Amino acid sequence: MAKSAYEPRLKKEYVERIRKAIQEQFSYANEMQIPRLDKIVINMGVGEATGDSKKPTVAAADLAAIAGQKPVITRARNSIAGFKLREGMPIGAKVTLRGVRMYEFLDRLINIALPRVRDFRGLNPKSFDGRGNFAMGIKEHIVFPEINYDKVDQMWGMDIIVCTTATNDDEARALLKEFNFPFRQ
């Protein structure tokens, strides 16, 4: 893939400022030890998919608009009679962002989408998994500017997982704080 001349704002900030700040804070001997963003996974589970098979397709179209990349329709791995769910039924959509699209999505998430969330008090600082990854949930997908509120017939929630190369939660928390993640105090 040819290298494009465009470099996202957050990636440029990471290279110029954030890497140096993290290296000074944790005093790494090697530059490759400095944690960086690896990928962002966005998952949209559609609970009502058992009744209407078109709902995951509609959710996938909204997710494609938000992420700028075609999502994968996720299917049920096994049948659950209580949920009227059969193996192989479409139950949601997910997309994995890397590179330029990852930094662009992160920029929109931090600066546009999260401030538009109702009653937002900050991200939970305990949502790290112990290996340097951060998970969060958004209850309404209409907080993203790509979604036209008038054309939405149903609100979808989504899970957003930010995967980093950090080895522990403290390194990942420091990295995401440098990216201006609004953590709760």
UniProtKB/Swiss-Prot annotation:
What keywords appear on the UniProt entry?
Answer: Ribonucleoprotein, Ribosomal protein, RNA-binding, rRNA-binding, tRNA-binding
The organism's superkingdom is given as Bacteria
Cite a single Pfam family from the UniProt record.
Ribosomal_L5_C
User: Per the database entry, which stretches of residues form a coiled coil?
Assistant: none
Q: Which GO terms describe its cellular component?
A: ribonucleoprotein complex; ribosome
GO biological process per UniProt: translation
Q: Name one GO molecular function term.
A: tRNA binding
Tell me which PANTHER family the record gives: 60S RIBOSOMAL PROTEIN L11-RELATED
Summarize the subunit comment: Part of the 50S ribosomal subunit; part of the 5S rRNA/L5/L18/L25 subcomplex. Contacts the 5S rRNA and the P site tRNA. Forms a bridge to the 30S subunit in the 70S ribosome.
- Which family does the record claim for this protein? Belongs to the universal ribosomal protein uL5 family.
Per its database record, what is this protein's job?
Answer: This is one of the proteins that bind and probably mediate the attachment of the 5S RNA into the large ribosomal subunit, where it forms part of the central protuberance. In the 70S ribosome it contacts protein S13 of the 30S subunit (bridge B1b), connecting the 2 subunits; this bridge is implicated in subunit movement. Contacts the P site tRNA; the 5S rRNA and some of its associated proteins might help stabilize positioning of ribosome-bound tRNAs.
Q: What is this protein called?
A: Large ribosomal subunit protein uL5
